Amino acid sequence: AKNNQQSGKSQSIVVGTWGAEVTSGVAFDDGSYTGIREINFEYNNETAIGSIQVTYDVDGTPFEAKKHASFITGFTPVKISLDFPSEYIVEVSGYTGKVSGYLVVRSLTFKTNKETYGPYGVTSGTHFKLPIQDGLIVGFKGSVGYWLDYIGFHLAL
């Protein structure tokens, strides 16, 4: 499916993860859906990305996945509402780096076929980028402790 939101039940692969390899946070894997409608997350301009919660599409119906919450407060919330199904993510990028000795995801940017959301957070450290020529992001995975320890994605091909 070439950037086709109606990808149905095609095969999916996991890409990533970016960030920590070992974490004391709570790992999550939302699984695969038919698309992404909304991304809610938190960031702090001094530290890193905090909680994350994604609303997916399941065959035309919104499905709000569980919030993967930070252990701490002091973040700024962001809501990215995509114009589903005509708007979809074509690139995710960000920075990983150390905060208080922990390797975490410090910044995220989501680029769609219509606009760029971000960067949110601290744009220093090691840059990562996932450009998507073919396929579609249909799920998020990662780990959240004090901050977002790492992030990865399910890609429908």
UniProtKB/Swiss-Prot annotation:
One of its GO terms (molecular function) is carbohydrate binding. It comes from the Eukaryota. Keywords: Glycoprotein, Lectin. Signal peptide: none annotated. Alpha-D-galactose-specific lectin. Has hemagglutinating activity towards human and rabbit erythrocytes. Is highly cytotoxic to human cells in vitro. Tetramer of heterodimers of light and heavy chains which are non-covalently linked. This is Galactose-specific lectin.
